[in-house]
Amino acid sequence: MSIKKLDYWLIESLMDTDLYKITMLQAYYHAPEFRLVDIEWKFACRNRNGLDLSILIPEIFRQLEHLCTLSFSDAELDYLAGFSFIKPDFIEFLRIFRLDMRFVHIEAKGEDISLRFSGPLLHVSLLEIYTLAIISELHTFVNCGGIDLKVARERLAEKIAYLKAEDDLSGFSFADFGTRRRASKAWHEEVLLTLKEQLPASFSGTSSLHFARTLGLPPIGTMAHEWFQSWQAVTRLADAQKAALEGWVQEYRGRLGIALTDCYSMDSFIRDFSDPYFGKLYDGLRHDSGCPFVWAEKAILMYQQMGIDPLSKTLVFSDGLNFPRMLEIWKRFKGRAKISFGIGTNLTNDVGNVPLNIVIKMIAANGRPIAKISDEPGKSMCEDLGYLQYLASQYGIDPSLVKISQ
């Protein structure tokens, strides 16, 4: 079975990605450790459930070919240069930057998609978000028949009404983290415009650089798991998490200071982070797996034991959120720390269809495995169980508890 070519391009700007892809790319660009590092990334769909994704491959390939013709415009670069944390030499690198199809390998694996990126870290990292957004939107229009805007708008209105029904939302804020799994780019834009108008006090911004620029929203983001994983390739495994935290400090000098805690586990993160040097330099922490309530209690206790007032720090929650869950967490911890949220699929792909739970993760560097473990076993992604177990042992995690998953 083949599908009809779309008569439009799903990605029309290299800015149509998340802020943290650009901030991590700049950190890689400046760090001498990564100049000769080749990285392999792998796509996985965690809820295919018999769906034939292979029919999307020709159009994915065509859309990626178009993506590789794009470059940053002068206006886009001027926008990026306006941020104090983006440096002039990196702007000049972006001015000549192009993606390259030579690093893309895609084929059918039965009815599934076998998709990998393999090449120099600086030249393959940005492929992740664009590709996920392309696959997600193709799924919407090919497998789901499009978006029922009546249903989508009703669901968005219900979310907004749910928040407005609260008597006091002072101090409550959330941002859009939904670029990678959005139902469509057009729906993504409508969601952001609606939230900007309807919830100006609570809606804090978007991870999307494109929409931050075009809609006048604050861009939100710092680092992702790839930053922590990549350090496994260039330092001792037991030191990789500390090296990643220090590398970020050296690049951003206290700016963009929200640290992701679950590349290995929250407990191992606390072991490496519970030093006033990191505790005072970083503005806060981000939760992305495991129980958010247990995680937050551990974070607050860690700060207290360092002699740091938790109310001076921000705890960001971004794992599989919906609006009731956000309010539940906020009510539990408001007044104990600054609380913020990043919400993705439930915001940009709650349109009546079943969204794909898709990821593209680093799996190897310079031909050797790398991995994340997380606070949730089902979120591990690696092709070498022996390596995953050894990595766990280096971070105080029982190797028998980790497993390879998609």
UniProtKB/Swiss-Prot annotation:
Catalytic activity: nicotinate + 5-phospho-alpha-D-ribose 1-diphosphate + ATP + H2O = nicotinate beta-D-ribonucleotide + ADP + phosphate + diphosphate
Signal sequence, renumbered to the chain: none
HAMAP family to which the protein is assigned, alphabetical: NAPRTase
UniProt keyword terms in alphabetical order: Ligase, Phosphoprotein, Pyridine nucleotide biosynthesis
Organism: Psychromonas ingrahamii (strain DSM 17664 / CCUG 51855 / 37)
EC number(s) given by UniProt: 6.3.4.21
Identification of the protein by name: Nicotinate phosphoribosyltransferase
Post-translational modification: Transiently phosphorylated on a His residue during the reaction cycle. Phosphorylation strongly increases the affinity for substrates and increases the rate of nicotinate D-ribonucleotide production. Dephosphorylation regenerates the low-affinity form of the enzyme, leading to product release.
